[in-house]
Amino acid sequence: MAMSEQPQPVAGAAASTTKARTSFGILGAISLSHLLNDMIQSLILAIYPLLQSEFSLTFMQIGMITLTFQLASSLLQPVVGYWTDKYPMPWSLPIGMCFTLSGLVLLALAGSFGAVLLAAALVGTGSSVFHPESSRVARMASGGRHGLAQSIFQVGGNFGSSLGPLLAAVIIAPYGKGNVAWFVLAALLAIVVLAQISRWYSAQHRMNKGKPKATIINPLPRNKVVLAVSILLILIFSKYFYMASISSYYTFYLMQKFGLSIQNAQLHLFAFLFAVAAGTVIGGPVGDKIGRKYVIWGSILGVAPFTLILPYASLHWTGVLTVIIGFILASAFSAILVYAQELLPGRIGMVSGLFFGFAFGMGGLGAAVLGLIADHTSIELVYKICAFLPLLGMLTIFLPDNRHKD
C-alpha cells in the first residue's frame, strides 16, 4: 500500500503542525499496524488457560509471563523514545516488528515455561520499539489535531487487543498452542505496512533536515510540570492495575465463579476489550474540544461506582458492568498522553515512551501482584481489592488546566 500523503513539518513543537493538513491515510496505516501489533500481544493473554493446562502453571507463574512481557516493553520504551527524539530512526518500526514475529514463532514451538517467558520477552521488545515511534508518527500526521490523531492510533491497538481473544477462541483453543504460528501472517503484514510508513517518515525527516527548529516554550513552571506528570503516572497506575485484573484474570474469574467454558469466558473478555476499543475513540476528540483534564477526571473517577458493584454482580450484570467499565476507562489514555506531550513539548518520543512504558510496566506488575493474591486467597478477592483503584481519580483536581487553541 503506497503512502502518498504530502510531507508535513515534523512536530517538534506544537506550533509546527498547526497549519498542516491531517494525513488520514498515514493515521489509518499506523492504526492498522497498531491493531496487528496489539492483536499479536493479546494472544499471549488469551491463551493463558492453555498454557496453564500444558505446563501446570500457578497464578503466580501466569503473572510472571505478563510481567516478563511488560517489563521487556516498559524498560526499553523511554530509552527508545529519548534516543529517537535526538536521532530519528524511521526504519526502526519494521525492525521492531521482526522481534515480535520471532517471539510468535517461539511461542508456537515452546516446550517449556522458560521458552514461553523468552517468547513473551521478544514480543515485549518489539512493542518497546513500536509504541513510542508510532505515537510520534501519529502526531506528525495529526495536522495539529493531536487528540484525534492519538485516538485513531489508539483505537487500532484496542481493537487489536479485543480481536486477539476472539481469534484465539476460534483458531487456537480448539487445536492447541501450535496454531499460534498462523499469526505469523499478521506480523508479516504489519512489517509490510510499517515499511511504507517508514518511507513517509523518512521523507518527513529529509524535508525538515537543515531547517531552523521552532522555539520550544514550556507552558508551565518546572515544579508544576513535575507535579502534573507525577499525578498522571499515579492515574496510569490506577488504570492499568485495574486493567491487568481484567485482561489477565477475567476468564479465570468467570470460569471459577460462574462455571463458564474457556471459549465462553474468552467471548466475555472480547466484549470487554471491544468496549475498550470503542471508548478510546471518544477520549482524544472530546479532549480537543473541552480539555484533557476533564476527560481524565471523568474516565478514571467515573468508573468507580461500577467497579465497586462488580464483585457482587450476577453473570449477566458482570458482563454489562465490565463493558461499561471498559468503555469509560479507555477514554483516559489518549487524553493523558496528549496532556503530557503538551506539558513537555519537543520531547514527543520520550513522553510517549515513558507513558507507554509505565503503563505496560504497571500492567505487568499488577498481573504478578494480583496473581500472588489470587494464589493465596481467591480470584474474587482480587476484584474486591481492585474496585477501589479508580478512586485515585480524585487526584485529577490538582492537575493544571492547560487548555489552549491549536
Swiss-Prot record:
Homology family: Belongs to the major facilitator superfamily.
GO terms, molecular function: transmembrane transporter activity
GO CC terms, sorted: plasma membrane
Cytoplasmic side: 124-151, 199-225, 288-294, 341-353, 400-406
Bilayer topology: Multi-pass membrane protein
Organism of origin: Escherichia coli (strain K12)
Protein name, per record: Fosmidomycin resistance protein
Periplasmic side: 1-42, 85-102, 173-177, 247-266, 316-319, 375-378
Pfam families, sorted: MFS_1
GO terms classed as biological process: DNA damage response; response to antibiotic
